[in-house]
């Protein structure tokens, strides 16, 4: 089994999503000691945002020297995603959405003819069979039923984007309200870690 571990938080040691994604990966390692883990830190090694040059290169246009390295990084990211049986993503909420570096990565793996295709009845995802676990952190409370639920363009987007690629086995390990005081923060993290441990059940 192969696991792709991605972090997108711009924070270091204080990142809740990084702490939780590491917990999730540790749970899968304990369950399968032979697990192969590939690590991708999108904050430390960002992928360039999609541009007209990237699209032209995908259609066979000559690649400039300035773009060549970034195209290779994007191709490697796609290959790592395709090879993974399990994908674990640390995804904090920034201004109601995901980190821009995570969006850049998603743009690079969303490739017509490779991870999805257009059929007679609309788009068809080609990545079914993968398991996705998202370690989600939020300063406020935006889960379903909360007054601020309409502001959630983080988990809702990720579910839609990966669903579009055919992934239906999606689990969110969520710690929210982490900016609303130390007690709520510690409680949210503890609850999320319990949910992560339950993945081994």
From Swiss-Prot:
Catalysed reactions, as listed in the record = 2 a quinone + NADH + H(+) = 2 a 1,4-benzosemiquinone + NAD(+); N,N-dimethyl-1,4-phenylenediamine + anthranilate + 2 NAD(+) = 2-(4-dimethylaminophenyl)diazenylbenzoate + 2 NADH + 2 H(+)
Q: Does the keyword NADP apply?
A: no
Cofactors needed by this protein, per the record, are: FMN
Q: Is Flavoprotein among the key words of this record?
A: yes
The UniProt transmembrane annotation reads none
Q: Which InterPro entries match?
A: Flavodoxin_fold, Flavoprotein-like_sf, FMN-dep_NADH:Q_OxRdtase_AzoR1, NADH:quinone_OxRdtase_FMN_depd
* HAMAP family, alphabetized: Azoreductase_type1
Protein name in the entry: FMN-dependent NADH:quinone oxidoreductase 7
Q: Which organism does this sequence originate in?
A: Burkholderia lata (strain ATCC 17760 / DSM 23089 / LMG 22485 / NCIMB 9086 / R18194 / 383)
Gene expressing this chain: azoR7
